[in-house]
Amino acid sequence: MMLSRAKPAVGGESPHTDKRKKKGRKIPKLEDLLSQRDFTGAITLLEFKRHVGEQEEDTNLWIGYCAFHLGDYKRALEEYENAAKEENCNPEVWVNLACTYFFLGMYKQAEAAGFKAPKSRLQNRLLFHLAHKFNDEKKLMNFHQNLQDIKEDQLSLASIHYMRSHYQEAIDIYKRILLDNREYLALNVYVALCYYKLDYYDVSQEVLAVYLQQIPDSTIALNLKACNHFRLYNGKAAEAELKSLMDNASSPFEFAKELIRHNLVVFRGGEGALQVLPPLVDVIPEARLNLVIYYLRQDDVQEAYNLIKDLEPTTPQEYILKGVVNAALGQEMGSRDHMKIAQQFFQLVGGSASECDTIPGRQCMASCFFLLKQFDDVLIYLNSFKSYFYNDDIFNFNYAQAKAATGNTSEGEEVFLLIQSEKLKNDYIYLSWLARCYIMNKKPRLAWELYLKMETSGESFSLLQLIANDCYKMGQFYYSAKAFDVLERLDPNPEYWEGKRGACVGIFQMILAGREPKETLREVLHLLRSTGNTQVEYIIRIMKKWAKENRVPI
């Protein structure tokens, strides 16, 4: 935003200046202060000159320029708006005013001021970014075509690539500029940020180290380093990296304090989320997403949905989170519509060119096929990144279900038993699938023990039904009979008696065939006697007769 200057900001020296020089005193020149990026000093000089009546041409613009570069956008806005009201104002004020509106998030005002400005490279870059903000693809492409192969335009293009999640394209531009401009150290931070977004956290650290060697107290760089540590190690390691920033209470960037508070919530696993995140929802883009994640972890699916339902997703992370929330709500409400929306979001991300070969992209395709119950396809994707999630309970939970659903109950059982989370191990989906694996793997006693550990509830009743029916199908009649017996006691449904009768007769047949111990007959008779059905006596009479003939004690 440096204003073009045809002459020095300070005019010819007055006699008073000569006198001061003779006394050995020297007032700094505006040009020198600007070249040293001493914007505070420059503002002080300009305000002093304004106060003593030595105001130079375009003083408002220069104070606005300095305030802008100090991050004091409100002060810059005040100066530029005053300058714009002047008769025959410098036309360059409009593009600078537009940039200030942009940084204040006042995009409509920025566009209006931008169109009043004379055509320039800066105006085109500004309108290019505004088109992105307004999701106006047609205007975006028009302004894109006006970009030239100069550093400022290419950096602007790289920024748009980054915001559109085209991280590799942004990296290519930054690296090309760095080849000829090694002194542009900050570009290393941008490259590191792109690698972070691509999940290459170790590469991001290496690139970031180049910048931190020169500027070790950079707020943005230290924060990114902490985020890399969070991904590579854990929250404690990340928090340790932020300590120097937290100790630096004199940081001039107010936004940094908010950023640190936000990231500490993430690093601490959601601790303090309800106190810190809500006020930041419209300040830090990730705050809304992390608050949604917090609600999901607290099983408050409805609150998560309320927070994200009106968000128009533009990044893969937003699409993924909307998919997860809709899937959770669909399961909770039994809503096919929400499940379909979730499946479409997952497919959109997983099928995109930028995400199809990333782990999140493959996770999305696995989730899409999971919702479609196409478990062979689920396994293709899960197997492609299995090595990264060996000890991850959520991954193992889904992987085991997919294995069991495709008939590989042996491996499904093994993976289910790797899960450590007590919350997952008490989930009915876990219990029912593990019970099914046990039954299919000829371990019905273990399935029965899962039921015995449960408290009486609707879920324990459902597990009984599963054990009764699956054991019957597998010819494991003893545990089928026990399950049907309990079901019959809880609910005198004729179907349960029929199941119990069939299972008891099945056990008797297995005893006759020598595939079940004869002593089991005593318990079968006990199960039958607990039923008041008229058919019981006939069945018992036949069994007793056989027992007597074969000298089996009953």
Curated annotation (Swiss-Prot):
Q: Where in the cell is it found?
A: Cell projection, Cilium
Family matches, as InterPro entries: TPR-like_helical_dom_sf, TTC26
Question: GO molecular function of the protein, one example?
Answer: intraciliary transport particle B binding
Alphabetical keyword list: Cell projection, Cilium, Protein transport, Repeat, TPR repeat, Transport
Positions of the TPR repeats? Answer: 57-90, 92-125, 151-184, 468-501
What Gene3D superfamilies does this protein map onto? Tetratricopeptide repeat domain (1.25.40.10)
Instruction: Tell me if Transferase is a UniProt keyword of this record.
Output: no
Cross-referenced Pfam families: ANAPC3
> Which GO biological process annotations does it have?
axoneme assembly; cilium assembly; intraciliary anterograde transport; intraciliary transport; intraciliary transport involved in cilium assembly; manchette assembly; protein localization to cilium; protein transport
User: GO CC terms on record?
Assistant: centrosome; ciliary basal body; ciliary base; cilium; intraciliary transport particle B; neuron projection
- Its principal location? other
Q: Where is this region: Disordered?
A: 1-27
| Residue spans of biased composition, Basic residues class | 18-27
- Oligomer and partners: Component of the IFT complex B. Interacts with IFT46; the interaction is direct.
Function, as annotated, reads:
Component of the intraflagellar transport (IFT) complex B required for transport of proteins in the motile cilium. Required for transport of specific ciliary cargo proteins related to motility, while it is neither required for IFT complex B assembly or motion nor for cilium assembly. Required for efficient coupling between the accumulation of GLI2 and GLI3 at the ciliary tips and their dissociation from the negative regulator SUFU. Plays a key role in maintaining the integrity of the IFT complex B and the proper ciliary localization of the IFT complex B components.
Q: What is this protein called?
A: Intraflagellar transport protein 56
Source organism lineage?
Eukaryota, Metazoa, Chordata, Craniata, Vertebrata
